[in-house]
A protein has these predicted regions:
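Class II aminoacyl-tRNA synthetase catalytic cores and aaRS-like
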Residues: 1-582
């Protein structure tokens, strides 16, 4: 596995019974020290595994403590039957040594036990990341990350994509999240920006005649952290294809994601083709554009049934229902907990009915139902005896989201989600535009550079809020892995789209001059997407927080506690970039 040198001839993870009797030298960290009646046992750890070492002369251990680094030589010996450890690969052998040398001393008091570092306060972990990364579980996540990225890179090469690096020093974009800005020393008052994504560069590559581009792209966004979003930077498998349709992109994404998830997980994975779910359908049936399809519960539109109701909470509201199979037997406490959850997310209450054996209803909403409503509800929801029907009513904007949260919470509380599989889908047919609630102006919903469905004709003749775009997301188990689009490569369509969103042609020239100019010199139709590498690894390692799959993550407040970033700089450094702090 390694080339022999003065520190080691083998690694701690490779010795087996066939090595018994051999003289070896190993090096690593002292994971544990145990005294068994004058015979000392050490567990020595390196990246490749753990090896038990036996020391009969305790004088050899006078300078040795946990987590110091050592090199030692000795003889490989078969373990006694009662000491065999089948939990580790080297568990049938041990090394007996009379020669140990300390290579790197370690303080006697550790800030936390390496083996249990994941249970330690986050701030302490991030200050001593080099210790946390020794934890085998954490260490393994980073090794898996390396393997996954290597696999992705090889797969893209195999599929004919060319890896091209795009600039890290770029210009600020008027769209998207906040930029990280870098002041220029040579150009007073001007700033570079770290790219939020290689969006414009990869489109320019298509105009430049490159047919299939990809890179494992670093992206930088000044946005708040979440469990599935690292503050500061993240990585994408960014790819773009010339002369390509939406289905061409889907075919590439399906092959890459299916093979990656099959290789690095034992779970069942959706087989291509993945489900295509229109955005409007997803918002109706699942209450989100990031549906977890492992959850069997479905939301149903029932607003029309309550248009003339006397029940004030439903009057002139968007009303949705969720049928929960076999839930009628749940305790009063269970229903109370669900109501408390509903209140915690901003609902004024959570109405429901239980379906009796004779298909009549029992519950607080029943008395507000008209003749025929019960049969209609049972029909629309597919309800059976013993089921529960929940009701969610609110504004047209809020009701879908609230229903989606109730759907998810009920499934979690009843353990309805099948955790043994990865369920992937594409969300398609996103609206191109939406109306800003504060200004009432038409704005882009997502990517302003996507192609509207129907082209220029739809922009000229449709209500902007009815125009759909060739935009799409990939979702896996309720986590958005990627967004993408067929790009708008036609300058006339682009001008009209931006005009509808309140941009003049001069604005377009000023803010997006590179694309505006390039698209006047023969731009090909092109499309692409960018699956999030960190999120993929998070799912494959079954970690709940993205920090656990990043070697040097920031804390939730966007601070690097190990290096002290962001940090102060000198007055001289500020003068060089023409900045004065106030």
């Amino acid at each position: 596995m390694i080339k022999a040198n003065e520190y080691r001839t083998v690694t701690c993870g490779e010795l087996r019974e066939e090595n018994i009797g051999q003289q070896v030298r190993v090096a690593g960290w002292v994971e544990n020290i145990r005294d068994h009646g004058g015979v000392m046992f050490l567990d020595i750890r390196d990246q490749y595994g753990v090896l038990q070492v036996v020391v009969h002369n305790d004088e050899l251990l006078k300078d040795i403590n946990k987590e110091c680094t050592v090199t030692l030589s000795g003889t490989v010996v078969k373990r006694d039957e009662e000491t065999i450890n089948k939990k580790i690969a080297t568990g049938f052998v041990e090394v007996h040594t009379e020669d140990i040398k300390v290579l790197g001393k370690c303080k006697n008091v550790l800030p936390f036990e390496v083996a249990t570092s994941t249970n330690t306060n986050e701030e302490v972990i991030l200050k001593y990341l080099f210790l946390d990364l020794r934890n085998p579980k954490v260490h393994n996540n980073i090794m898996i990350r390396s393997q996954i990225i290597t696999f992705l890179r090889n797969k893209m090469n195999e599929m004919g994509f060319m890896e091209i690096q795009t600039p890290i020093l770029s210009t600020s974009s008027p769209e998207g999240a906040r930029d990280y800005l870098i002041p220029s020393r040579k150009h007073k008052g001007r700033f570079y920006a770290l790219p939020q994504a290689p969006q414009i560069f990869k489109q320019l590559l298509m105009v430049s005649g490159f047919d299939r581009y990809f890179q494992i792209a670093p992206c930088f966004r000044d946005e708040d952290a979440r469990a599935d979003r690292s503050p500061g930077e993240f990585y994408q498998l960014d790819f773009e294809m010339a002369f390509a349709t939406q289905e061409d992109v889907f075919a590439v994404a399906e092959e890459v994601l299916y093979e990656t998830f099959k290789k690095f997980s034992n779970k069942e994975v959706s087989k291509p083709p993945f489900a295509r779910i229109p955005y409007a359908e997803s918002m109706l049936k699942y209450g989100t554009d990031k549906p977890d399809l492992r959850n069997p519960l479905v939301i149903v539109e029932i607003s029309d049934m309550f248009e003339e109701t006397d029940f004030a909470p439903f009057r002139k509201k968007t009303v949705r229902s969720i049928n929960v199979p076999n839930a009628a037997g749940q305790s009063k406490k269970w229903f109370k907990k669900m109501e408390e959850f509903a209140l915690s997310i901003g609902m004024k209450g959570l109405g429901y009915v239980k379906v009796r054996d004779d298909l009549t209803f029992d519950g607080p909403i029943d008395k507000f139902l008209k003749e025929g409503d019960r049969e209609e509800l049972i029909s629309r929801n597919g309800s059976k005896a013993g089921d529960v029907i929940y009701f969610i009513a609110d504004t047209a904007q809020e009701a879908p989201k609230l229903a989606g949260q109730i759907r998810t919470e009920v499934a979690k509380r009843l353990d309805l989600i099948d955790t043994s599989r990865f369920e992937m889908c594409f969300i398609v047919d996103f609206p191109m535009f939406e109306r800003d609630e504060e200004t009432n102006q038409i704005i882009f919903t997502h990517n302003p550079f996507s192609m509207p469905q129907g082209g220029l004709d739809s922009l000229l003749n449709k209500d902007p809020e009815e125009v759909l775009a060739y935009q799409y997301d990939i979702v896996c188990n309720g986590v958005e892995l990627s967004s993408g689009a067929v790009r708008n490569h036609d300058i006339e369509i682009m001008k009209k789209a931006f005009e509808l969103a309140g941009y003049s042609e001069d604005d377009l020239k000023a803010k997006f001059s590179a694309l505006y100019n390039a698209f006047q010199y023969g731009a090909p139709p092109h499309a692409g997407m960018a699956p999030g590498v960190d999120r993929m690894i998070m799912l494959l390692t079954e970690e709940e927080n993205i920090r656990e799959v990043i070697a040097f993550p920031m804390n939730s407040n966007a601070q690097d506690l190990l290096l002290g970033s962001p940090g102060e700089v000198t007055e001289q450094q500020l003068r060089e970039v023409h900045i004065k702090l106030r």
